[in-house]
């Protein structure tokens, strides 16, 4: 197809003496003449049916306008001469009515003509067909036996366009196809072997004709398959192709289908192969029965074989494919515009098989008939020399072989045009020294103009060897100098006209790099910076400085930052290379470069096993990049893998060579290896481990360590050891052979090797051996064994059987008094090691206090003291002893913290790992008298309105003879100061004035310090200061009463509301709890018409319940009698209540009698009953630590004695009755009891009860002391 005339590109006529020209758009030739050029052509073949019109398109462009004409069967065809034939206005498209289609079918061609030539269209072959129909035929049933092949024919009507074939049944359901049943390319339905289930009366072949859009169907075929009792299998036989050797023609660029359909029983399977080369995949279809070749090329030429197999035999068919080609373009003739006198050459090179015949025509007339003046053919090309304006024409090149024609139109246009300067005048050019500059002078004219350049000195430019003028008029000046600047002149002319233009050349200084960057070496992960400076010609702006890496722009990476310098942070090996600094202007650029060298740790790869046996391996590997630092060594790491173990990699250093000497391997292991390269910058990264190397099991190479033998019970021996780790087993499992034998012969004859070894094989420790004499030495050893054998011979160790209680006790026990609270005890150990029956662990000193020096024997002992070791038929100690433990082989100890002026006894015993031995004989000693301490605390609490409780505590160092307590009422008009001599550190002062305050003082005896003073009061404390701000009122209802009260806004106090029936003797009952912030409370459950007393009860700081408001409330209504039969009227209930009241009355009487009764007490005895709790080892001795032998019984005694002795607690007796632990709650020790030994007997009465006092006189009270 020809190119448009305006804007046609300049094309070279290859091998020709001339070249076509293109009129530039800016030349302005708007009315330029154009030869005809076809834009729409009729198809090569057109098939029409009775209802279709024949439409043959033919449209062309040209100036002057184009005229159209047609030919039919190479004869002129005039549409106007045929009724029903017309031409579309404005084009050459031919329309033939459908009624004339059958009569006017044939070969048509279109011609488009104007003053410059004639363009010819390809031939269009018009075929008129009738509507396809199947001829009437008589269809007979197809009858076959089971297993026979069947072919159901289709035979559709013939057509220029083959139809698509479908096989369906009468329900319009497709016949299922598979390896046994399939449709061939001819439309027939093939059965490789018939089955009884194939019997159907309605096999219908449908043909779909795409042109007329019609589907027709064949008469149904009745297939009847008779069952057979003797179905025999048979070898395959080809149904298609019918000839075992078939030749197929395939056209280049098209597709071809090769087909093989076979019959046989069982159903054959088809496969394909190419005999003269490989078979490309993807072309097999239709259950392997077809092979399709797409986009056929000459390489597909050859033989293809199909093979049908079914186990009974083989059938083969060969397809010989010959590839041919319709004509196709190798070099197509091109249209062109030429000037007068030029030579034109039009090439027409066509390929095809068979080789096509080429025919040249001029304006649709064969060249032979058009005359040969100034035209000749050369190698298929048409050459036209010395062109003249009247040589303009349209030339046709048509190629043809048996597969069809190929036609191309190319016009030849000869024109004459005056000269026109296309480049603007006075253009300005800038260039840098030593560069090349191009000064343009574009011109156009036909014939082509001649161009000449003049320098600023008006000399021809071509006189300078540095200048060159191109055919398009441009001047090139190379290696420009500073003096080359100035105004240049271009002059052009052709046969019709001439013209000129000027160009200004300015020469600039080059751009230079003033401070080039320096190469750098950086370690991976560091930051590196490059600096660069440049100078620019001041007349050239702007100048730009850019950074590149390897000639490419810097990557889009935040690690690269560019400002006055370039910085690369966290450098990696990929950053290594050439760094360029480029300074550029619109005219030139300068560049300097530096090398970035990144160093780091080297990698290694491709680990391979060179040689391996049971106990060693040799490895090799490929060293990786050394990252600019030579590899110093390789570290070979080995890992052992087992099902029950996986330990980390162990390492071995290898010098620089990439292989290892033999490396040892442990038995029964899987050993992956990896290699790490090392250079001056450290170890490289690990590569993937190698495939594990497995070694067979072997006997253990070592025995377990930590073998120890020791008894944990008398007469046994427990042998333990540290089990081998799994990696030392050398096998899937390991056991232990444990052996033992006595170290000495019976009778102590010394070591002997005559004893046989006893042994036991176990999986894990321990091994326990029983029935042995106590603490006897044994030789023991443990050997590892596994399925491959025994470990090395084990070295025996020594162990001992279990210990027994010692039979020996300390002798020569003596006591040395050091001061009133410390003594030194010494002893020796009797007997020998055999009597010790174990390892000596230490000694225990057991001691206890008997009482004060000089007092009589105790009358009673603490209940159930804990048992201590003692000699037979010997009485136990009176108090639980205190134990001092001394570790090791000691021969003495210090006993400190003893009570002065006291009698003590002690015993010493030895102990081993099993326990304590028998104690020594008891040794008695006495401590000298000590110094009393001052009183430490005096506490006073109110008991009731006329009594106070007094508690005194001090640290005693000797026997106390008494206490002097002074007290005085502090209110105005009070009585004189009173006093009392106390024999007990706790007592009650009774008969005091009610609601009075007293000052009490307790001086020490002798008076080393001022007296200890305090203040007490018999006045009860109010519950809270807010009660004085209460305002209370009440009103009664029928079954309840509402009580309203007011208090300060910030008060939030809870209290109890109590009530009682005023007309009965019932006690106060609690209704509930109220809160001062609620301002009201409602009493519920009252009887109508009844008067009640109501009071509020709060708790003061001493914990007492105190009533702070009382009033009366009257409910409304009358009393309604309750119906009889209630529980309260039952006789059994009245009797039960009476019994409870009687028991409570008896208990109250007994308590009153006990509270009023006086008694005797002995301060001395109470002090004797205390166990000294301050005994502890002295810091200047090294005999060990104390261990108390007091049992839970002692704790229970202490807790029991304190249960009823708290101040103000229920059941508290008078001072004379004894209160053993009355100070225990105040932080004192248990030794706080005071009893007199008979020197003070009876009760002491005070100065007399006050006016408001009541109750019995205090037993603590005595004559007043002034």
From Swiss-Prot:
Disulfide bonds join 58-110, 154-205, 260-306, 348-397, 441-490, 532-581. SMART domains: FN3, IG, IGc2. Residues 36-128, 135-221, 236-322, 327-413, 418-506, 510-597 form the Ig-like C2-type domain. One of its GO terms (biological process) is dendrite self-avoidance. Keywords: Cell adhesion, Cell membrane, Disulfide bond, Glycoprotein, Immunoglobulin domain, Membrane, Repeat, Signal, Transmembrane, Transmembrane helix. Binds to itself and to axonin 1. This is Neuronal-glial cell adhesion molecule. One of its GO terms (molecular function) is cell-cell adhesion mediator activity. Residues 1154-1266 are cytoplasmic. Residues 862-881 have a biased composition (Pro residues). Residues 1-20 form the signal peptide. The keyword Iron does not apply. Mediates the adhesion of neurons to neurons and neurons to glia. It is involved in neuronal migration, neurite fasciculation and outgrowth. InterPro entries: FN3_dom, FN3_sf, Ig-like_dom, Ig-like_dom_sf, Ig-like_fold, Ig_I-set, Ig_sub, Ig_sub2. Glycans are attached at residues 97, 288, 390, 434, 472, 498, 712, 819, 1061, 1075, 1100, 1116. A motif (Cell attachment site) lies at residues 914-916. The keyword Acyltransferase does not apply. Belongs to the immunoglobulin superfamily. L1/neurofascin/NgCAM family. It is a single-pass type I membrane protein. It is found in: Cell membrane. Residues 603-698, 700-804, 809-930, 934-1021, 1022-1118 form the Fibronectin type-III domain. Residues 1163-1195 have a biased composition (Basic and acidic residues). Pfam families: Bravo_FIGEY (PF13882), fn3 (PF00041), I-set (PF07679), Ig_3 (PF13927). Residues 21-1130 are extracellular. It comes from Gallus gallus (Chicken). PROSITE patterns: FN3, IG_LIKE.
């Amino acid at each position: 197809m020809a190119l448009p005339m305006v804007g046609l590109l300049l094309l070279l006529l290859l091998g020709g003496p001339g070249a076509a020209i293109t009129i530039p758009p800016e030349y302005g030739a708007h009315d330029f003449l154009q030869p005809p050029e076809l834009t729409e052509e009729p198809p090569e073949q057109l098939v029409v049916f009775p209802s279709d019109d024949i439409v043959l398109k033919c449209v062309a462009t040209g100036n002057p306008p184009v005229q159209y004409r047609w030919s039919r069967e190479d004869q002129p065809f005039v549409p106007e001469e045929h009724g029903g034939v017309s031409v579309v206005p404005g084009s050459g498209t031919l329309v033939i009515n459908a009624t004339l289609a059958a009569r006017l079918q044939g070969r048509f061609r279109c011609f488009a003509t104007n003053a410059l030539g004639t363009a010819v269209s390809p031939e269009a072959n018009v075929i008129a067909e009738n509507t396809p129909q199947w001829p009437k035929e008589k269809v007979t049933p197809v009858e076959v036996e089971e297993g026979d092949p069947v072919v159901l024919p289709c035979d559709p009507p013939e057509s220029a366009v083959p139809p698509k074939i479908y096989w369906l049944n009468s329900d319009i359901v497709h016949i299922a196809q598979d390896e046994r049943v399939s449709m061939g390319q001819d439309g027939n339905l093939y059965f490789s072997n018939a089955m009884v289930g194939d019997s159907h009366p309605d096999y219908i072949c449908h043909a779909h004709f795409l042109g007329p859009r019609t589907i027709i169907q064949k008469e149904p075929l009745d297939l009847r398959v008779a069952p057979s009792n003797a179905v025999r299998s048979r070898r395959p036989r080809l149904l298609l192709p019918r000839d075992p050797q078939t030749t197929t023609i395939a056209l280049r660029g098209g597709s071809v289908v090769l087909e093989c359909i076979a019959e046989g029983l069982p159903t054959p399977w088809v496969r394909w192969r190419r005999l003269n080369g490989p078979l490309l995949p993807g072309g097999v279809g239709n259950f392997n029965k077809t092979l399709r070749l797409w986009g056929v090329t000459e390489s597909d030429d050859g033989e293809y074989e199909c093979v049908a197999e079914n186990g009974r035999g083989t059938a083969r068919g060969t397809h010989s494919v010959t590839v041919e080609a319709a004509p196709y373009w190798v070099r197509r003739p091109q249209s062109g515009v030429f000037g007068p006198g030029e030579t034109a050459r039009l090439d027409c090179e066509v390929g095809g098989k068979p080789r096509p015949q080429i025919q040249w025509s001029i304006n649709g007339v064969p060249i032979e008939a058009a005359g040969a003046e100034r035209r000749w053919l050369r190698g298929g090309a048409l050459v036209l020399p010395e062109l003249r304006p009247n040589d303009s024409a349209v030339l046709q090149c048509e190629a043809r072989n048996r597969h069809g024609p190929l036609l191309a139109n190319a016009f030849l246009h000869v024109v004459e045009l005056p000269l026109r300067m296309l480049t603007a005048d006075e253009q300005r050019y800038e260039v840098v020294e030593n560069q090349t500059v191009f000064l343009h002078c574009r011109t156009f004219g036909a014939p082509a103009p001649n161009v000449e350049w003049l320098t600023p000195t008006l000399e021809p430019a071509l006189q300078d060897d540095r200048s060159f003028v191109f055919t398009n008029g441009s001047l090139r000046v190379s290696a420009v100098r500073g003096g080359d600047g100035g105004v240049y002149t271009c002059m052009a002319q052709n046969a019709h006209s001439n013209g000129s233009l000027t160009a200004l050349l300015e020469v600039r200084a080059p751009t230079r790099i003033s401070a080039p960057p320096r190469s750098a070496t950086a370690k991976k992960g560091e930051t590196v910076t490059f600096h660069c400076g440049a100078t620019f010609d001041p007349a050239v702006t702007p100048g730009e400085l850019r950074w590149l890496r390897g000639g490419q722009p810097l990557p889009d990476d935040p690690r690269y930052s560019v400002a006055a310098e370039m910085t690369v942070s966290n450098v990696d090996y990929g950053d290594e290379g050439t760094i360029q600094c480029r300074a550029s202007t619109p005219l030139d650029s300068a560049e300097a470069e530096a090398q970035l060298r990144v160093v780091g740790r080297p990698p290694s790869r491709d680990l391979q096993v060179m040689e391996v046996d049971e106990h060693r391996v040799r490895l090799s590997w490929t060293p990786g990049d050394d990252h600019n630092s030579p590899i110093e060594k390789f570290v070979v790491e080995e890992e052992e893998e087992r099902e029950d173990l996986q330990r980390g990699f162990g390492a071995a250093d290898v010098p620089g060579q990439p292989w290892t000497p033999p490396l040892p391997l442990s038995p029964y292991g899987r050993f992956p290896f990896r290699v790490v390269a090392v250079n001056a910058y450290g170890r490289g990264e690990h590569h993937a481990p190698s495939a594990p190397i497995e070694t067979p099991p072997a006997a253990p190479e070592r025995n377990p360590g930590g073998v120890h033998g020791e008894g944990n019970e008398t007469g046994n021996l427990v042998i333990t050891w540290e089990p081998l780790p799994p990696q030392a087993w050398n096998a899937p499992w390991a056991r232990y052979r444990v052996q033992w034998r006595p170290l000495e012969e019976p009778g102590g004859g010394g070591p002997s090797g005559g004893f046989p070894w006893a042994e036991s094989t176990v999986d894990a420790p321990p091994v326990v051996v029983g029935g042995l004499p106590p603490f006897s030495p044994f030789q023991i050893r443990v050997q590892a064994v596994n399925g491959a054998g025994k470990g090395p011979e084990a070295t025996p160790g020594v162990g001992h059987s279990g210990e027994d209680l010692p039979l020996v006790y300390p002798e020569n026990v003596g006591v040395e008094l050091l001061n009133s609270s410390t003594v030194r005890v010494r002893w020796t150990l009797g007997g020998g090691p055999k009597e010790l029956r174990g390892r000596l662990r230490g000694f225990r000193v057991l001691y206890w206090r008997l009482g004060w020096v000089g007092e009589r024997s105790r009358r009673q002992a603490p209940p159930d003291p804990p048992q201590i070791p003692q000699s037979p038929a010997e009485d136990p100690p009176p108090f639980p002893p205190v134990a001092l433990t001394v570790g090791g082989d000691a021969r003495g100890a210090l006993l400190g913290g003893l009570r002065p002026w006291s009698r003590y006894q002690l015993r010493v015993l030895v102990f081993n790992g099993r326990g304590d031995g028998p104690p020594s004989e008891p040794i008695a000693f006495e401590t000298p008298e000590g110094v009393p301490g001052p009183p430490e605390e005096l506490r006073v609490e109110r008991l009731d309105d006329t009594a106070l409780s007094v508690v005194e505590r001090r640290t005693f160092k000797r026997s106390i003879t008494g206490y002097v307590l002074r007290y005085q009422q502090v209110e105005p008009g009070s009585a004189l100061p009173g006093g009392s001599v106390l024999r007990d550190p706790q007592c009650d002062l009774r008969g005091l004035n009610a609601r009075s305050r007293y000052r009490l003082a307790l001086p020490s005896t002798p008076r080393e310090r001022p007296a200890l003073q305090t203040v007490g009061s018999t006045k009860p404390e109010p519950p809270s200061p807010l009660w004085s701000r209460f305002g209370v009122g009440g009103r009664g209802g029928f079954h309840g009463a509402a009580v309203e009260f007011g208090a300060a806004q910030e008060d939030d106090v809870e209290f109890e509301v109590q009530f009682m029936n005023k007309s009965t003797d019932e006690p106060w009952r609690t209704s509930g709890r109220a809160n001062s912030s609620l301002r009201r409370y409602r009493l519920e459950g009252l009887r109508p018409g009844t008067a009640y007393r109501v009071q509020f009860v709060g708790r003061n700081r001493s914990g007492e319940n105190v009533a702070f408001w009382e009033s009366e409330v009257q409910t409304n209504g009358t009393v309604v009698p309750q119906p009889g039969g209630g529980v309260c009227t039952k006789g059994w209930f009245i009797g039960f209540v009476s019994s409870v009241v009687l028991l409570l009355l008896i208990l109250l009487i007994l308590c009153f009698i006990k509270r009023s009764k006086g008694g005797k007490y002995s301060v001395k005895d109470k002090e004797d009953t205390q166990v000294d709790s301050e005994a502890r080892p002295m810091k200047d001795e090294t005999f060990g630590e104390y261990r108390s032998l007091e049992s839970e019984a002692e704790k229970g005694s202490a807790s029991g004695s304190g249960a009823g002795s708290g101040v103000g607690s229920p059941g508290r007796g008078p001072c004379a009755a004894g209160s053993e632990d009355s100070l225990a709650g105040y932080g004192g020790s248990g030794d706080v009891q005071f009893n007199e030994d008979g020197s003070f007997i009876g009760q002491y009465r005070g100065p007399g009860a006050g006016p408001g006092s009541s109750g019995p006189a205090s037993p603590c009270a005595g004559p007043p002391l002034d």
